[in-house]
Swiss-Prot record:
Subunit structure: Part of the 30S ribosomal subunit. Forms a loose heterodimer with protein S19. Forms two bridges to the 50S subunit in the 70S ribosome.
Ranges annotated as biased composition (Basic residues): 107-116
InterPro entries xref list: Rbsml_uS13_C, Ribosomal_uS13, Ribosomal_uS13-like_H2TH, Ribosomal_uS13_bac-type, Ribosomal_uS13_CS
Keyword line: Ribonucleoprotein, Ribosomal protein, RNA-binding, rRNA-binding, tRNA-binding
Region Disordered, residue ranges: 93-122
Organism: Wolinella succinogenes (strain ATCC 29543 / DSM 1740 / CCUG 13145 / JCM 31913 / LMG 7466 / NCTC 11488 / FDC 602W) (Vibrio succinogenes)
A GO term for molecular function: structural constituent of ribosome
Role of this protein: Located at the top of the head of the 30S subunit, it contacts several helices of the 16S rRNA. In the 70S ribosome it contacts the 23S rRNA (bridge B1a) and protein L5 of the 50S subunit (bridge B1b), connecting the 2 subunits; these bridges are implicated in subunit movement. Contacts the tRNAs in the A and P-sites.
Pfam families named among the record's database cross-references: Ribosomal_S13
Keyword Ribosomal protein carried by entry: yes
One GO term describing the cellular component: cytosol
SUPFAM superfamilies named among the record's database cross-references: S13-like H2TH domain
GO BP of this protein: translation
Name of the protein in its database record: Small ribosomal subunit protein uS13
Length: 122
């Protein structure tokens, strides 16, 4: 089993899809990496040699932010928005949708379960 960027890649999958198991690498990025190091998209992970795995690993390290580094960067970007006091930062702080979605009836994913208000009977 190949291990790249701290992630065990599934053996039987094609390498272009297996690389998408790494946080921060999608299908297009995966294909770009493989074309840069001249590895066929049809190869399975179990068919890769150690040299090919190290080539892929080196390319990812030098060109892309993945896994922990990327998660840390996203967290820091959100924290910076909150510290600035921007509208987006305030929405993050309040746990509400950030990108303009309506919140009168929806937004349950961000707001959580409904809170009961008032009493049921008089």
């Amino acid at each position: 089993m190949a291990r790249i960027a701290g992630v065990d890649l599934p053996k039987k999958k094609r390498i272009e899809y297996a690389l998408t198991y790494i946080y921060g690498i999608g299908l297009k990025t995966s294909r770009d990496i493989l074309s840069a190091v001249n590895i066929s998209l049809d190869k399975r992970v179990q068919e890769l040699s150690e040299d090919e795995v190290s080539l892929i690993s080196k390319k990812i390290q030098e060109s892309y932010a993945v896994e922990g580094d990327l998660r840390k960067k996203v967290t820091m970007d959100i924290k910076a928005l909150m510290d600035l006091g921007s509208y987006r930062g305030l929405r993050h702080r309040k746990g509400l949708p950030v990108r303009g979605q309506t919140t009168k009836n929806n937004a349950r994913t961000r707001k959580g379960k409904r809170k009961t208000v008032g009493s049921a009977s008089k």
